[in-house]
């Protein structure tokens, strides 16, 4: 996925399309048994790429079963569980996006 992101970034740069930020999707999951974060695809890879390309890193979205269920049912996480951890992640990303645009 990181290779595809690099290709996309390079393509957008070639055609002079501004990139307003990068979000890392499926960045980690929290184990139901031990409550620990597990980075199964690597850690901070997208953040490092964002720094290298001088693009704002907006945040990360973990792998989350409830988010998948909400998405499958067409119910946004912010509507279904506005105080949940996933909703907080989306709000943080939105705030970081606003900061990068100011």
List the predicted regions and their residue ranges.
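Conserved Switch II/interswitch segment of TRAFAC-class P-loop GTPases
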Residues: 1-7
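C-terminal lobe/tail of nucleotide-utilizing enzymes
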Residues: 11-102
């Amino acid at each position: 996925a990181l290779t595809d992101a690099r290709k996309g970034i390079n393509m957008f740069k070639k055609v002079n399309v501004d990139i307003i930020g990068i979000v890392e999707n499926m960045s980690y999951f929290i184990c139901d048994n031990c409550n620990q974060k597990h980075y199964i695809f690597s850690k901070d890879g997208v953040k490092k790429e964002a720094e290298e390309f001088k693009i704002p890193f907006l945040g990360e979205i973990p792998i989350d079963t409830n988010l998948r269920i909400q998405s499958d049912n067409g119910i946004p996480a912010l509507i279904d569980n506005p105080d949940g951890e996933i909703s907080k992640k989306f709000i943080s990303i939105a705030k970081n996006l606003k900061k990068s645009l100011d």
